[in-house]
């Protein structure tokens, strides 16, 4: 068990802070400050998972959760919006991996899981030609896939809903909420 007070010394200066002893239970979600006071049970579970994740993540963190799992975590950035963007991009990539374009990819037999996962990451990202170029795709796919266009990605991401967002601190500006909404946070 960690000490109740954590101490770190940096260049002769001692910093100390108390251990995070936040109890994560239904009481945590009792003070709803938004206009919509209805939180479905599934959202409470996702929010609890976000808070548990954040409790054990580096300070200044944001977590997106959906369906009982963390789908994007942004930690240790210098500003809250950078955490929100980083975690949101990870959440977007999680959702893009479930698109019909990705689910329909036909991989060569006996491809290793890591190679398949890396190919998917490249396919949904900006470096898609690394896996679609002649001489490359033949080692990964049975059939050369079509490019997953920016317009197709945007259309698929627009269907992302039911995502919960947790933060270990206050969002000082609306830009965080706007960015989170683009990744399905309601």
How would you label these PLM feature ranges?
Residues 1-186:
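ATP-dependent carboxylate/acyl-activation modules
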